[in-house]
Design a protein with these regions (language model features):
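Conserved N-terminal glycine/acidic-rich loop preference
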Residues: 2-3, 25-42, 109-122, 129, ...
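Beta1-alpha1 glycine-rich phosphate/pyrophosphate-binding loop at the start
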Residues: 1-60, 146-172
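FAD-binding core/adjacent interface of flavoenzyme oxidoreductases
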Residues: 56-133
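Alpha-helical segments flanking ligand/cofactor-binding loops in enzyme cores
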Residues: 9, 124, 146, 178-179
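Short glycine-/small-residue-rich flexible loop motifs, especially phosphate/cofactor-binding loops
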Residues: 51, 91, 178
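Short loop/edge segments at beta-strand edges and connector loops
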Residues: 62-65, 160, 183
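Glycine-rich Rossmann-fold phosphate-binding loop(s) that bind the pyrophosphate
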Residues: 1-2, 135-138
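Glycine/Thr-rich phosphate-binding loops of Rossmann-like dinucleotide-binding domains
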Residues: 103-104, 143, 166
């Protein structure tokens, strides 16, 4: 994820770093609304193969899924899908497994075509929907509802607690988004 890439790039300046990921690219959790309504546009900015990060040139990447960690031996076991199990020793273990609340998060090992297929499947489901319910009045929920509504062709309902979405935001912003969502 975003944090794992940042940590790896910083540590690679002074340490030997091995990055282990179930995907060969950064699949950012940013801009969910754009991801759902404009997957091709989202992909250009938020699906970035690790090889495009110059600061990761010094990081050895392993494409696979960690199946176990032996804290006493300081080793992780990695299932590399088609290449078998690898044992990676470490001096310091940094765990940056990403946010667990996103619907796109899972621990399957994927290649870029599988990620593209998943994006296309979600886009097709949304395109075919007559009505979409978005639950959550925070920034992500509001962004998703706004992006879906602006795309058109679908009735979008935003469900949130409280009188208006974006609790804690300035009242002017809250009024603006309510007007925008109603239009």
């Amino acid at each position: 994820g975003d944090t794992g890439v940042l940590v790896a790039t910083r540590l690679a300046r002074s340490c030997q770093v091995v990055g282990i990921s179930t995907r060969p690219a950064l699949v950012s959790g940013q801009e969910l609304g754009n991801r759902l309504t404009d997957p091709a546009g989202w992909r250009r900015s938020y699906l970035v193969p690790y090889r495009r990060f110059r600061r990761l040139d010094r990081v050895r990447t392993v494409h696979g899924r960690i199946t176990s960690v032996d804290l006493d031996r300081r080793e992780v076991r990695v299932d590399r899908t088609y290449l078998g199990i690898a044992v990676e020793p470490y001096d310091v273990l940094v765990i940056a497994t990403g946010a667990s609340n996103g619907f796109w998060r899972h621990d399957r090992v994927e290649d870029l075509p599988a990620i593209d297929d998943q994006l296309a499947t979600v886009a097709a489901r949304l395109e075919a929907a007559a009505t979409i319910a978005v639950v959550g009045g925070g920034a992500t929920g509001v962004s998703v509802a706004d992006n879906l509504a602006r795309r058109g062709g679908t009735e979008v309902h935003l469900f949130h607690s409280g009188d208006v979405p974006l609790p804690g935001y300035h009242p002017k912003v809250r009024r603006w988004i309510v007007r925008r969502l109603r239009d």
